[in-house]
Amino acid sequence: MSTKEKLISHVMKEEPVGSRNKVTVVGVGMVGMASAISILLKDLCDELAMVDVMEDKLKGEVMDLQHGSLFLKTKIVGDKDYSVTANSKVVVVTAGARQQEGESRLNLVQRNVNIFKFIIPNIVKYSPNCILMVVSNPVDILTYVAWKLSGFPRHRVIGSGTNLDSARFRHLIGEKLHLHPSSCHAWIVGEHGDSSVPVWSGVNVAGVSLQGLNPQMGTEGDGENWKAIHKEVVDGAYEVIKLKGYTSWAIGMSVADLVESIIKNMHKVHPVSTLVQGMHGVKDEVFLSVPCVLGNSGLTDVIHMTLKAEEEKQVQKSAETLWGVQKELTL
């Protein structure tokens, strides 16, 4: 008799039970690992699968996390073979070529499209009913690419979009007002990144419109220069990349925030990238961030945000820029 047999006596033969809320992270780079640890520490799933083409790096990261299993409640698995991801509820795609210092997010695009041509069909093969969350940049275009390559309905393909831009925005407004970001309600919509649109008309604290108190807020004529905050939001990522080489922690937390809303069916409203054709005067098939309701089925509803004419024009301009790139892509 083995030690195990002496220690434990079987009462019944266990039937294999699939994971009820499995999450997969594709890509074990800085963003993938920050997303993984954020998901683990929020205890969102009973199984976390990780997949990457870089076998040694993947194996090392998985082992490193598994060594902390005592402190977690989640089973952690990893393999370069996508069968490890089977039956995932949510699949988070962070893989792709990394943005270099000074490189625009749009520049990355065709490099990442080619990577997606391998990743997306594999996800669909093993998790045909999953909710696909795209984080790789340029996120709006790659969410469109993932939607096209997957054949999924639009409500099951979501881009992390401006969830992080809005978090940065709320943090900086909070700093200026000496308030916690959760008490500063503010939204950034449109493209994630350089042409994102701050909705100054909607910024409020406890329902008090800040533009109601300062009608010039967000404009050139504003003596308090609130406009600089949006510039800081846009430059923030570039600044972090310049200082430490990449961004990871905040986007990882942002991803876990979105995964939580889906897994726990919270019906929370998030600015995420979705198909906006027909909204805010957008005519083309593009994905941009607008406030959306996230739950167990994916993206269930879109909130009709009241935008000023100038804000709407900026969203349309974003859409035109993205469509200009998208129509050149070879899918």
Curated annotation (Swiss-Prot):
GO terms for molecular function: L-lactate dehydrogenase activity. It is found in: Cytoplasm. Keywords: Cytoplasm, NAD, Oxidoreductase. Its EC number is 1.1.1.27. NCBIfam families: L-LDH-NAD. Homotetramer. Interconverts simultaneously and stereospecifically pyruvate and lactate with concomitant interconversion of NADH and NAD(+). Belongs to the LDH/MDH superfamily. LDH family. This is L-lactate dehydrogenase A chain. It comes from Notothenia angustata. The gene is ldha.
